[in-house]
Amino acid sequence: MLNPQILDPLTETQLKDLIGCFENNSMMKSYPGRQFALDLVDAVDIVKDIIDNALGKDSWTVAGGNFFKTEVGYRVHADTGRDGPDNVLQTFVFPLEQEFRQGLVQVNPNRNRLLILKQQWKGPAAFFLHGEETEPNEYNVVVRDYEQEGVIGLENANYLDPLLVDYCPHLNMENFRGLSVDQQFIWIPGIPMTFPRNRLHVSSAFPRYGIRSKLGLSIFTSKK
């Protein structure tokens, strides 16, 4: 698998066409503060060459993904799906838009970030919720005892990464015990990024910095 990294920019046409795929999507799901579009056929055609360049032609298949438009920062999670640890490859994230708030909040788009952690997970897609009893009604399983349940590469059990404390105040700080940041990427529309599907990752508290919402595309790849 490839280390977390930025990829070559989308063309203006690719960016426009991907936004159109979201806006005209036939499979939409809405939740409070979040909206997902699940029909990826046309989107995969648009970005196929980008993924081929990263992974090699005919070496990968699409295992899942979605368009997402969100007004809230997301939890610590892993995109492992249910393929089994030997099949997962990369997550590809394509930032498409961000909308800024008007008014009193000072806008700071540099605080809109995706943080990729050093820790790995070999189980099914999961949220990592050490220190809280929340039970999200979503596809992902919930992991609370990181050491006992098999999170790989943990720091000391009491460790709190200052980057997570700084960028993610929307979450319970206890979620971050033993976790550490490997890479952090600023959310720039048109600049794709990739990281291994088994890596834990989390978004920053972007609404606190004048960003109303962000739109992106995630594609999860597995070995062919």
Annotate each predicted stretch with a short phrase.
Residues 1-78, 102-110, 130-153:
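Non-heme Fe(II)/2-oxoglutarate
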Residues 71-199, 204, 208-224:
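Catalytic core of non-heme Fe(II) oxygenases with the double-stranded beta-helix
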